[in-house]
A protein has these predicted regions:
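Sequence signature of WD/YWTD-type beta-propeller architectures
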Residues: 1-116
Length: 116
């Protein structure tokens, strides 16, 4: 069996895939974070794209100066997205580090926003 490689995104942004759990349980959607500047932790959205239709959806948008990234999906239903969330209203001394962030979960079934 041979596989043919396919490009599924074409816009000029950095679509950052985590190295594990990026497919929805039905294997139809890929989740990623969008980083305007390569590997920097400066993304504002967590998004997903349908592998066949190329339809894109924003799952979460950070507000108040916060940044988000490193998105993963629960491998079993219900679909839940987990990702790193930086602080709202960071000061000039803030930099990306393990003690300057939190993990959050967004449940696709409910519109509750991000839950710590």
């Amino acid at each position: 069996m041979s596989f043919q490689e396919q490009q599924i995104t074409f816009d000029s942004r950095h679509h950052q895939l985590t190295n594990i759990n990026v497919w929805t349980p039905d294997s139809q959607w890929l989740v990623y974070d969008v980083r305007p500047n390569g590997g920097s932790f400066t993304g504002l959205t967590i998004e997903k794209i349908h592998a066949k239709t190329k339809q894109q959806q924003i799952i979460y948008t950070a507000t108040q100066g916060a940044h988000v990234g490193v998105a993963t999906i629960s491998p079993v239903a219900p679909v839940r997205y987990a990702f790193i969330h930086g602080p709202e209203n960071p000061d000039d001394l803030w930099h990306y580090d393990f003690h300057h962030r939190r993990g959050v979960i967004v449940n696709e079934q409910e519109d509750l926003g991000a839950v710590n």
